[in-house]
Swiss-Prot record:
Keywords: Cell membrane, Cytochrome c-type biogenesis, Membrane, Transmembrane, Transmembrane helix. The keyword Membrane applies. This is Putative cytochrome c-type biogenesis protein HI_1454. Could be involved in cytochrome c synthesis. Belongs to the DsbD family. GO terms for biological process: cytochrome complex assembly. InterPro entries: Cyt_c_assmbl_TM_dom, Cytochrome_c-biogenesis_DsbD. The chain crosses the membrane at residues 15-35, 46-66, 77-97, 118-138, 154-174, 192-212. It is a multi-pass membrane protein. The keyword Transmembrane applies.
Length: 213
C-alpha cells in the first residue's frame, strides 16, 4: 500500500514538474489570456483541462495495453535504463536534440473564447508541448505500462494530469494575484528542471528494481 501511495505521489509530482518546465511555465499568461475571453475563465479552464486529459489518458491506456503484451523483466529494465538516460538529459549533462523541439500549434480564436475553442486549445497544448515534456512524460508512460493493464495505465496518466492541471485550476480562480507572483518564479525554472531530472532518474531506478510490483 505504501509503495502504491509513493508511486501515485511521484506521478503527481511529475505532472507538477511538467507545468513548471522552462518551455511551458513562461507562456501560461498567454493561455490564460485566451481562456479569459468571454468572462467564462473557470469554465474554459476546465474544458481546456478536459482536452489535454483526453490526449494523455489515451496515451496511458494505450501504453498499459501494450505493456500487457510487451513488458517482461528484460523490457522493464531496458525501459528503466532509457528513463534514467532521459533524466540525465533533463539535468542538462547532455542533450537529446529531438526532445528540445516543440511543435507550436496556432489556434485562431474569436473575440470571445468559446467552449469548443477552450477544449481544442487543450488538445493542441497536449500535442504541441509533448516533445518538450517528453522526458517526464516518457517516464510516467513507462510506469503506466509496467503493470500490463490498460486501465492501470490510464489511471496513472490521470494522476499525471491532476498534477499538471492543479496549477491551471488555481490560476483560474486566483489568476490576478498568482500571475503577478508567478513572474518571480521564472528565474528559478532551471532549478525546477533539475528537480524534474532527479525525479525522472528516481522513476527509472524504481522501474529497474521493480519496487512498485
Amino acid at each position: 500500500m505504501l509503495d502504491q501511495q509513493l508511486l501515485i505521489g511521484t506521478v503527481f509530482l511529475a505532472g507538477l514538474a511538467s507545468f513548471l518546465s522552462p518551455c511551458i511555465f513562461p507562456i501560461i499568461p498567454i493561455y490564460f489570456g485566451i481562456l479569459s475571453k468571454g468572462g467564462k475563465k473557470v469554465l474554459n479552464t476546465f474544458l481546456f483541462i478536459l482536452g489535454l486529459s483526453l490526449t494523455f489518458v489515451s496515451l496511458g491506456f494505450s501504453f498499459g495495453f501494450l505493456g500487457n503484451i510487451l513488458f517482461s523483466n528484460t523490457t522493464r529494465i531496458i525501459a528503466g535504463v532509457i528513463v534514467i538516460i532521459l533524466g540525465i538529459h533533463q539535468l542538462g549533462i547532455f542533450k537529446i536534440g529531438l526532445l528540445e523541439r516543440t511543435k507550436l500549434v496556432e489556434i485562431k480564436t474569436s473575440g470571445k473564447s468559446t467552449a469548443l475553442e477552450a477544449f481544442v486549445l487543450g488538445l493542441t497544448f497536449s500535442l504541441g508541448w509533448t516533445p518538450c515534456i517528453g522526458p517526464i512524460l516518457a517516464s510516467v508512460l513507462a510506469l503506466s505500462g509496467d503493470e500490463g493493464s490498460a486501465l492501470y495505465g490510464a489511471s496513472m496518466m490521470f494522476v499525471y494530469v491532476l498534477g499538471l492541471a492543479t496549477p491551471f485550476v488555481l490560476f483560474s480562480f486566483f489568476s490576478d494575484s498568482l500571475l503577478k507572483r508567478a513572474k518571480g518564479l521564472n528565474k528559478h525554472l532551471d532549478k525546477f528542471k533539475i528537480g524534474g531530472g532527479i525525479l525522472i532518474i528516481v522513476m527509472g531506478i524504481l522501474l529497474i528494481t521493480n519496487n512498485f510490483s
